[in-house]
C-alpha cells in the first residue's frame, strides 16, 4: 500500500506542461519576491536534483544539516512545512495546498 501511495505521489509531481504553467503563476505570486533575483533567498534555477543547501547562498544551519538532494518528496515536504523539514530554516512561507505544491514543484523542475 505504501509503495502505491509513493508511486501516486511521484506521478502527481511529474512536470507536465499545464502543471508547470500553473506552477509558474503560483511561483510568481508566492516565491518570486525572495527567489527571483533578490538577496533574500537563493536562486531556484536547477534546484530539482541538486544537493540540499548547495550553491552561492548563506543557507541556514537547519538546511546545511540536511543530507540528500532536492527530490520531489523533499521539495514537497519543505514547501509544506519548512520548519518541520529543516528546523532553524530562514524560510517561513509554506504552501499548504497539495495541488499548489505539486504545481510549484513542476515549475521548479523546468528551471535550469
Q: Would you name each region that the model predicts?
A:
Residues 1-6:
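Bacterial N-terminal signal peptides that target proteins for export
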Residues 10-18:
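N-terminal signal peptide c-region/cleavage motif recognized by signal peptidases
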Residues 20-41:
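Sequence/structural segment immediately N-terminal to covalent heme-attachment motifs in c-type
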Residues 26, 54-56, 107:
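Extracytoplasmic copper-binding redox domains, predominantly the cupredoxin/blue-copper superfamily
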Residues 41-47:
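Short cysteine/histidine-rich zinc-coordinating motifs and their immediately flanking basic loops
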Residues 42, 56-105:
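Axial heme c-ligation environment in periplasmic c-type cytochrome domains
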Residues 48-51, 79, 108:
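Hydrophobic aliphatic residues
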Residues 111-112:
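Short, solvent-exposed mixed-charge patches
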Amino acid at each position: 500500500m505504501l509503495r502505491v501511495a509513493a508511486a501516486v505521489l511521484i506521478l502527481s509531481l511529474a512536470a507536465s506542461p499545464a502543471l508547470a504553467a500553473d506552477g509558474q503563476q503560483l511561483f510568481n505570486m508566492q516565491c518570486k519576491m525572495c527567489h527571483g533575483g533578490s538577496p533574500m533567498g537563493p536562486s531556484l534555477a536547477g534546484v530539482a536534483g541538486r544537493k540540499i543547501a548547495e550553491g552561492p547562498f548563506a543557507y541556514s544551519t537547519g538546511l546545511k544539516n540536511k543530507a540528500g538532494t532536492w527530490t520531489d518528496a523533499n521539495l514537497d515536504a519543505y514547501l509544506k512545512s519548512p520548519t518541520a523539514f529543516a528546523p532553524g530554516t530562514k524560510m517561513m512561507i509554506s504552501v499548504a495546498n497539495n495541488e499548489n505544491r505539486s504545481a510549484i514543484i513542476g515549475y521548479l523542475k523546468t528551471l535550469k
